Amino acid sequence: ISMISAHILSAAGLILLAFLPEAFADPFVGLLVSVTVYAIGGGLLEVLVSPVMESCPSDNKEKAMSLLHSFYCFGQVGVVLVSTLFFAAFGTGSWRILALIWAVLPIVNAVMFTKVPIGSLIAEGERGMTARELFSSKTFVLLFIMMLCAGASEQSVSQWASAFAEKGLGIS
């Protein structure tokens, strides 16, 4: 259910991105709400995909996990290329349509995940931590803060690299 919810949130955020900015007096509020929704979905996906992959029966888990983690980069390049081609063909004024087109991918994934049998990583007879136990763990809090800072750093570098490339290539 978590994987399906993550895909639904990702799709919902992208769909909201196409419509919500016009619904507010200040379009930034609509953008902020939309981005928050799809960021929650994307963040959940980033955290949940690895354990799902780990639970899949495979002869070579290391190879599969390595391939999985490389697809984040491939996906980023693919999104940039497809979006650039879309904008070249239809103009940047069609960005709302592009958001709706990108929303199709998580919708299809959500539907596909409803048919996937997922095994539990917790052994039979054992129980996982409750939410209260997890959030009161100092180790969890420390790792959560580290992941938050790492994500912020990653996004900062990503945005800087994009701005640098736009300025350097003269396409901004």
Label each region the model flagged.
Residues D59-N60, L67-L121:
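Helix-loop-helix hairpin linking two adjacent transmembrane segments in secondary transporters
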Residues S34-S70:
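Cytoplasmic helix-loop-helix junction between adjacent transmembrane helices
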Residues I8-A25:
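C-terminal ends and interior cores of transmembrane alpha-helices
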Residues S136-S172:
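Extracytoplasmic gate region of multi-pass secondary transporters
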Residues I118-L143:
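Juxtamembrane intracellular "pre-TM" segments in multi-pass secondary transporters
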Residues L9, V37, L67, F71-G75, ...:
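Small/hydrophobic positions within alpha-helical transmembrane segments
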